[in-house]
Amino acid sequence: MKNRVLVVDDAAFMRMMIKDILKKGGYEVVGEAEDGVKAVERYKELQPDLVTMDITMPEMDGITAVKEIRKINPDAVIVMCSAMGQQAMVIDAIQAGAKDFVVKPFQPDRVLEAVKKVIQ
């Protein structure tokens, strides 16, 4: 069975790129969200195996969304995909419960490597 993924980013182009990378890698993208509030709602509704999460988004940022999702499911698997790659931001994301952090702009292989590593 394919692993089910929720893609969260406020940029439609970035969601499309990540979805394309994941589909080519054999993953099933079951949903997407453009902000943290919708990400939490979609997570509850879809219960995906993995979430890719941006940090800087309207309504609710990605780190807050990670914390909210981890309240719903402490075992939630979340990979951050963000241009906010400063060390402090990466540490905040990991402490919030993210399993890995991919810095934009990224190579498709780096996204697949991160997803594969955390989903096993």
Where are these regions (language model features)?
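Two-component/phosphorelay signaling modules centered on CheY-like receiver
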Residues: 12-31
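Receiver (REC) domain active-site loop signature in two-component systems and cognate sites
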Residues: 57
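Acidic catalytic/metal-coordinating carboxylates
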Residues: 35-38, 61-64
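Short, conserved "switch-loop" micro-motifs in signal-transduction and mechanochemical regulators
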Residues: 84-85
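Active-site beta3 strand of CheY-like receiver
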Residues: 46-52
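C-terminal output helix
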Residues: 106-115
